[in-house]
Amino acid sequence: MQFCSIGSGSQGNAFIVQDKDTSLLIDCGFGLAETEKRLDNQGIKAEKITAILLTHEHEDHIRGAFSLANKFKIPIYLTHGTYKMCSKKIKISFEIEYQFIDGQKPFQIKTIAVTP
């Protein structure tokens, strides 16, 4: 398993966790073009992202998530509360696949087990 910071700070946060079968983007706080550039700099193609996991609704964690998900048909994993708050901040696309999680219980995204 590999873990890579795509960027961290007040301008944006994004991390990638990968194994041989799954590429999980944790948060996506940079705009679409910047996210694609940062992923490419790490040798990661945006279209290969399996899922996006949003930890919370702050702008520096969600800025590019919905655009990236919409462009590459990537599912977004998030809590109902995060979804509700995001929908107040940005236009939510109903074409995106949303997977609602319980922020207090472990869950699986393909081959990666996530424990909150």
Where are these regions (language model features)?
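Conserved beta-strand hairpin/beta-sheet module of binuclear metal-dependent hydrolase folds
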Residues: 1-42
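Generic preference for hydrophobic
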Residues: 3, 52, 76, 98, ...
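Structured catalytic core of nucleotide-sugar glycosyltransferases
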Residues: 4-15, 56-58, 87, 114
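A generic "binding-loop/recognition-motif" signal
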Residues: 11, 31, 58, 82, ...
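A generic structural signal for short beta-strands and their flanking turns/coil linkers
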Residues: 13, 22, 48-50, 72, ...
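Active-site metal-binding motif and surrounding structural segment of the metallo-beta-lactamase
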Residues: 33-81
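Metallo-beta-lactamase
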Residues: 80-116
